[in-house]
Amino acid sequence: MWDRCSEAAPAGPPPLPPAPAPAATRALSWAPAGGSAPEIIGHLQENYYNLCVEKSQKINYFILHKLQEVDKEIEKGLEGLTLNIAGNSCLMPVERVTGEDFWILSRILKKNLYINGLDVRYNLISDVGAYYAARLLQKQHKLIYLNLMFNDIGPEGGELIAKALHKNTTLKYLRMTGNKIENKGGMFFAAMLQINSSLEKLDLGDCDLEESTVHLGHMLKENHCLVELHMCKHNIKNCGIKQLCDALYLNGSLRYLDVSCNKITRDGMVYLADVLKTNTTLEVLDLSFNRIENAGAKYLSETLASHNRSLKALSVVSNNIEGEGLVALSQSMKINPTLSNVYIWGNKFDEATCVAYSELMQMGRLKPDNTDVEAFVVDGHVYLAEVSNGLKKHYYWRPTYGAACRHSANAGFTLVPVGGHL
């Protein structure tokens, strides 16, 4: 059992924070280009600095700098803030957050009333940090957004976080992307989702889960709160998509389904096209990097033309679709008034495809920001070029300049908002 009163680590794994570093090391671990540490000017900064000294923990000046930014926002009277300590910043030096850093950070956040979002993506918090993240979810009743993607969290850390969410009633958005929680950790998340009544967006993509659709399918039959689910790189095959579709007949809440980078072929599209005939909640469907080919695209096109009027966005990027299937999708858009976003790059374009999508854009049926191609003419022939739009272009990386949250580059989140910055 976890000790809910003490902040010390348990006797077993995860281990206690390391012994105190030498004083010279503790004094400065990151500093701005000028070489001096930032001035301690705010409440969060002061708490963090003092707690590091009290616990003989090395001060991470990247964290200190980010707390300074939030302190300034708090001074302006702002609430509902996200503390962004992402470890993949291209604009400043970064010392990545470790599990021991997260131990200190979680202690100063657990009673903070101004912060309801925490982004620590691309750091090194591991299972040690996952333990303290789980405790934070138990104690911090304002947190609605937690981004832990790519943090070396394993099955044990995944289990701790999933179990913490059994009783949590505030968290709405969790990203576990890229943490290798494997099937063991995935089982705990599937079980949690049959109990949890608040989580609306969950990303378990690239977590080394294999054919997780049996358990997540059972979850979808029971859960009526989840709005967005990412299952990228789950090794889903046609039998897996059938299990998901069986669950979608009974689910009335899911609006965004991401099954990109799997092994779904045209046979799987038979099941999906059939469920789309009756499903009225699904609005965004990401099939990128599968292999549905012409036949799969035609199954979808027929349903979109004749039955479905709820789907708003479809991505079939890199699915080995040729002109026949791509033209069929374009024809369905002329009939279906709801489908507004279509992404097709990475397939096999012929001239008929180029003409068909050029005509959709010229007539205003397909807006330039709602697709990943644009038309141009050379010697009287129409061609398509790629543009940087998509459902989640800036999901795994940040541009070196410009905004990372352009609506056209991250259309999926614009189409299915949960609230605020989520």
Predicted segment positions?
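Leucine-rich tandem repeat or coiled-coil scaffolds
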Residues: 1-422
